[in-house]
A protein has these predicted regions:
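Terminal targeting signals and extreme-terminal segments of soluble enzymes
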Residues: 1-150
């Protein structure tokens, strides 16, 4: 079946977003993911909730939101420090559901650092609704090579 590849099924992506070049491994399973670099050099990551992301109530599955929060918050270290990172701990608060068709966005800000350990606070939202708040502790690893353009 190729109905998911037809042009009329491709969702409209908000202006300023580009599809992330993450087509292998876990990214292939949960994507596609999108990213926008804002005028103030901050970033926003996003995804469109599809049927594949839902639980039995047709809400975006909490595990999907947690995986997305991990990528959205951890990216603050990639962007600011130009380093790879791994998650040490993530605390999430689910505030409201995201439904099929919702455009989910998220970002994070580094709020603390001790040696190679960073604390990042972030928010996940749909429009004006907060879906999740999160705080993550991440360990920075080696320096990242420059990103290739897709």
């Amino acid at each position: 079946m190729t109905d998911d590849l037809l042009e009329e099924n491709v969702p409209e992506i908000p202006e300023g977003y580009t599809r992330m070049n993450w087509f292998q491994g876990f990214g292939r399973q949960i994507g596609p993911m999108y990213e926008r670099v804002n005028a103030d050099k901050t970033y926003t990551r996003a995804f469109l909730v599809s049927e594949a992301h839902t639980n039995g109530m047709r809400n975006c599955h909490g595990g999907m939101l947690m995986a997305f929060a991990d990528m959205a918050l951890g990216h603050a270290i990639s962007l600011q420090e130009n380093r790879y990172w791994v998650t040490v701990r993530m605390v999430t608060d689910f505030v409201e559901a995201a439904k099929v068709g919702d455009w989910v966005e998220g970002t994070g800000v580094i709020t603390g650092q001790e040696d190679d350990i960073f604390t990042v606070t972030g928010r996940i939202w749909c429009g004006d609704r907060t879906v999740m708040s999160a705080t993550g502790v991440f360990k920075a690893l080696g320096v990242r090579p420059p990103r290739r353009k897709a």
